[in-house]
Amino acid sequence: MLTIIESPLFSKLWRNYWTVEDHGEFAAYLPANPEAGDLISGSGGCRKIRWTRSGMGKRGGVRVIYTARLASGSVVLLTIYAKGVNDNIPAHILRKLAEELGHEG
């Protein structure tokens, strides 16, 4: 089982979108499915996964950007945002964020 590591940014933002229960469901799902998100081209291995929010329906989902460090047994949650707010974060920004957090590629 992989360990979840939250970036300071993710830790600050997730409460804007999820209940504690939503957060727990996601934290239980991702370690078992680390490659579930779409690979973001040019990002150095970052992935984007779509996830729902309680009571928000199909259109009220969020996007979570993360990187899987399979060799070290961890998944790093980089950021979270509402669907439609930031459709695409530039790959070079994601790559830089992952590098700063010690992503191993």
Residue spans for each PLM region:
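Residues that recognize and position ribonucleotide moieties
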Residues: 3, 47, 87
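Amphipathic alpha-helical interface surfaces
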Residues: 6, 22, 26, 58-61, ...
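Basic/aromatic recognition patch in beta-strand/loop cores that engages polyanionic ligands
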Residues: 40-79
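Small/polar-rich, solvent-exposed N-terminal microdomains that initiate assembly or binding
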Residues: 30-41
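Arg/Lys-rich, positively charged N-terminal/basic patches that mediate binding to nucleic acids
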Residues: 1-21
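Sequence/structural signature of beta-propeller domains
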Residues: 20-25, 32, 45, 50, ...
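Enriched for short, Lys/Arg-rich terminal
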Residues: 68-105
